[in-house]
Amino acid sequence: MSRAGQITPTVVIEAEAYLSQSCRVMAGLIRTHGPCPLADREFRPFQTLANSIISQQLSAKAADTIERRVQAIVPGFTPAGFLAVPTEALRAAGLSSAKARYILELAQRVSDGRLNLEAMQEAPDADVIAALVELPGIGQWTAEMFLIFGLSRPDVLSLGDAGLQRAVRLLFGDDAKLEHMGQSWRPFCSVASWYLWRHLD
């Protein structure tokens, strides 16, 4: 399997044109919410993965609040920064004991070289997911969020994402299925997903 491409400004333009032409509802979302910003993300793999762990099973507002608190106590929001902070301080910032443990394990593996997140830029989507789900606290959803927001992969559709499922029902009817709708969005499912999430904001 070859490496998937990345979301670039050109890919965003192509994606928006394709989605607008292939799906009337998606065309409306693109007009309403404007250009997708996924191409503008800085490559910060550890930070992206740590934030994905923080966000698990939380509303966007709650996750943002905890993320800001953690950033305030972790120097640089880096692996070394996390490893220098007592677990009790992470708990006081709002992390559950499990999430604190997961992020510290991630930080340790990155620090000692057992996990090379930078090398994942060259790996196929399936290989990235397979490597990440071996880590404690990282499942399919977290790995898929890393593909979108950490590696800027253009064609990721997280079938288990409750927000995407809800948006599809709201926009396409109660009987609409995310997996079925996603077939018409390929190869730009990541961009389509961004617009669906914005619809819920």
Describe the role of every protein-language-model region:
Residues 20-57, 61-68, 72-75:
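A positional/architectural concept
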Residues 54, 87, 111, 115, ...:
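A broad detector of the eukaryotic-type serine/threonine protein kinase catalytic domain
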Residues 47, 83, 157:
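Residues that recognize and position ribonucleotide moieties
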Residues 38, 74, 111, 154-155:
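A short hydrophobic/aromatic micro-motif that marks alpha-helical segments and, especially, helix-coil
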Residues 6, 10-13, 25, 58-59, ...:
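Alpha-helical ds-nucleic-acid-binding substructure associated with the helix-hairpin-helix region
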Residues 1-37, 101, 121, 125-126, ...:
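C-terminal accessory module of base-excision DNA glycosylases/AP lyases that mediates lesion recognition
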Residues 48-53, 85-89, 127-131, 163, ...:
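A general alpha-helix detector
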